[in-house]
Amino acid sequence: KPKKAIADARATIAECIGALPEEIYFTSGGTESDNWAIKGSAFSDPYKRATITSSIEHHAVLRTCSAIESMGYPVTFVSPNRSGIITADALEELITENTRLVSIMFSNNEIGTIEPIKELVAIAHKHGALFHTDAVQAVGHIPINVQDLGIDMLSASAHKFNGPKGVGFLYIRNGTEIKPLNDGGSQERGLRAGTENIAEIVGMA
């Protein structure tokens, strides 16, 4: 029964964002998901080490980027225009062949802007970079289809769409190379160690 409950919840969450069930990894929330996406990407490629994010991200992203920067991983910050939008042209000016990850939030938690994710994904992929979006403010409120948008990773937190606190997920597109954040057991297909919080996972779905 517990395994079926988790599997059913995984399928429900996947359907909400246009993903496959095996692309959904349960976490403790948006902050863990952001940490995992950013650190897991940086640590996974010894040759492409740089990360680009925006100057108006949530602290979960900004402080994680500061952490990897202190470890010697280059981080560049792209600024929004006067309307609070990260434009494709602004990203194009900063991205290089050394860029491993571009991380831009889906919608801003303070000013409410919705970023042109599909355009930004296209720029990232043109240069061989992965694209992650912190969609904590968007999931459950804005229609999202990760396949249509081309997103590689997406973070979400249940309490932002009327679910319980302390649970969330990271969408990781099949084939994306990422290192685990935690060492330990084989939960979440060996990528996220730690006993699953079944009650909250079910509550999220």
Feature-to-residue mapping (PLM):
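Pyridoxal 5′-phosphate
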Residues: 1-205
